[in-house]
UniProtKB/Swiss-Prot annotation:
Protein name as it appears in the record: Apolipoprotein A-I
Biological processes, Gene Ontology terms: adrenal gland development; amyloid-beta formation; blood vessel endothelial cell migration; cellular response to lipoprotein particle stimulus; cholesterol biosynthetic process; cholesterol efflux; cholesterol homeostasis; cholesterol import
Keyword annotations of the record: Cholesterol metabolism, HDL, Lipid metabolism, Lipid transport, Lipoprotein, Oxidation, Palmitate, Phosphoprotein, Repeat, Secreted, Signal, Steroid metabolism, Sterol metabolism, Transport
GO CC, alphabetical: chylomicron; endocytic vesicle; extracellular vesicle; low-density lipoprotein particle; spherical high-density lipoprotein particle; very-low-density lipoprotein particle
The record's account of how the chain is modified after translation: Glycosylated.
Per-repeat ranges for Sequence: 68-89, 90-111, 112-122, 123-144, 145-166, 167-188, 189-210, 211-232, 233-243, 244-267
Sites bearing Methionine sulfoxide, chain numbering: M110
A GO term, aspect molecular function: chemorepellent activity
Lineage: Eukaryota, Metazoa, Chordata, Craniata, Vertebrata
Assembly behavior: Homodimer. Interacts with APOA1BP and CLU. Component of a sperm activating protein complex (SPAP), consisting of APOA1, an immunoglobulin heavy chain, an immunoglobulin light chain and albumin. Interacts with NDRG1. Interacts with SCGB3A2. Interacts with NAXE and YJEFN3.
Length: 267
């Protein structure tokens, strides 16, 4: 229970910097590294799920009848996309490094604000943890007689046990909801304070002069433009790699349609 409450605190205050237990000895990731890892996981999941759908279609009766060899084309497409990712790796890394460098001061200020707000809300989180542990203990005490009855065979039907448990479960749910609502109310001012601090930081940047904002905009545009220019060769390679795949799919599809038309005409 304590771990669950601490997890809630970490999620609320630090943006979920928790790692898997086998990664605890690794150096902490930067926010940009986490964003890049998340994007990679998303792309890989889409790629894997897409291949599963293609495989399921080819295994179906219609897929076997058409014989489009979609899985071979999908694997070729995947290889081409993977090559694109490898080619763009250094370019995107440079973009992330530049962006992280330009926004470093703002992240440092916000980290300080987060630590201050975290210190203020910690007593409320500790109080919530204490009350929740008390509720669990109380619920366990109320369940003990029912557990004893059930073990001794006094309750012959599971329905009887469910009828006795339902009021207790509803009571615990209502009390838990009340504690969560109280915690939400207590934390609301600090959430507003954090948003206000961020707005203040941005306002300071704005009031520091139009030249500063224009400079950041120009740098961002420059980085994006450089990313686009450096990505052109890799994108052209992707286009060239896709052409044989698309042509193969086109030929297979037209051949399948022609074969299907012949079967219809012969019937």
């Amino acid at each position: 229970m304590k771990a669950a409450v601490l997890t809630l605190a970490v999620l609320f205050l630090t943006g979920s910097q928790a790692r898997h237990f086998w990664q605890q000895d690794e150096p902490p990731q930067s926010p940009w590294d986490r964003v890049k890892d998340l994007a990679t996981v998303y792309v890989d999941s889409v790629k894997d799920s897409g291949r599963d759908y293609v495989s399921q279609f080819e295994s179906s009766a219609l897929g076997k009848q058409l014989n489009l060899k979609l899985l071979d084309n999908w694997d070729s497409l995947t290889s081409t996309v993977n090559k694109l990712r490898e080619d763009l790796g250094p370019v995107t890394q440079e973009f992330w490094d530049n962006l992280e460098k330009e926004t470093g001061w703002l992240r440092q200020e916000m980290s300080k604000d987060l630590e201050e707000v975290k210190a203020k809300v910690q007593p409320y989180l500790d109080d919530f943890q204490k009350k929740w542990q008390e509720e669990v203990k109380l619920y366990s005490q109320k369940l003990e007689p029912l557990r004893t009855e059930f073990q001794e065979g006094a309750l012959q039907k599971l329905q009887d046990l469910q009828e006795k448990l339902s009021p207790l479960a509803e009571q615990v749910r209502d009390r838990a909801r009340a504690h969560v609502d109280t915690l939400r109310t207590q934390l609301a001012p600090y959430s507003d304070e954090l948003r206000q601090r961020l707005a203040t930081r941005l306002e300071v940047l704005k009031e520091s002069g139009g030249a500063s904002l224009a400079e950041y905009h120009a740098k961002a545009s420059e980085h994006l433009s450089a990313l686009g220019e450096k990505a052109k060769p890799a994108l052209e390679d992707l286009r060239q790699g896709l052409l044989p795949v698309l042509e193969s799919f086109k030929v297979s599809f037209l051949s399948a349609l022609e074969e299907y038309a012949k079967k219809l005409s012969s019937q």
